From Swiss-Prot:
Cellular compartment(s): Secreted
Matching SUPFAM superfamilies: EsxAB dimer-like
UniProt main location, coarse: secreted
Residue span of region Disordered: 80-100
Cross-referenced Gene3D superfamilies: ESAT-6-like
Subunit structure comment from the entry: Forms a tight 1:1 complex with EsxA. An artificial EsxA-EsxB heterodimer interacts with EspA.
Protein name: ESAT-6-like protein EsxB
Family under the similarity heading: Belongs to the WXG100 family. CFP-10 subfamily.
Annotated knockout phenotype: Increases efficiency of DNA conjugation when disrupted in donor strain. Loss of detectable protein for EsxA and EsxB.
Gene name per UniProt: esxB
């Protein structure tokens, strides 16, 4: 079995990238919702109903994406912490068994 090397700093950086993407997506969501709200008074009839339904579907999908990005970021943070902790624990166990 091949050894797996991890770098907690790299994992933290990648988690931050997911957080950045999530933040950018939230900004886009806000812009789309703002535009939709501004146009709501002018959207009447079937076209208005269809446009509002499309905006609702967009919001649902975008919110799901934000949730997924946040979960990925949290999982990466947790993994980095666990890898570091496990590495330190194993190093301590090895040092103890070798009386170092």
């Amino acid at each position: 079995m091949a050894a797996m090397n991890t770098d907690a700093a790299v994992l933290a950086k990648e988690a931050a990238n997911f957080e950045r993407i999530s933040g950018e997506l939230k900004g886009v969501i806000a812009q789309v919702e703002s535009t939709g709200s501004a146009l709501a008074a002018q959207m009447v009839g079937q076209a208005g109903t269809a446009a509002q339904a499309a905006l609702a579907r967009f919001h649902e999908a975008a919110a799901k994406q934000v949730q997924e990005l946040n979960e990925i970021s949290a999982n990466i943070h947790t993994s980095g912490t666990q890898y570091t902790s496990t590495d330190e624990d194993q190093a301590g166990t090895l040092a103890s068994s070798m009386n170092i």
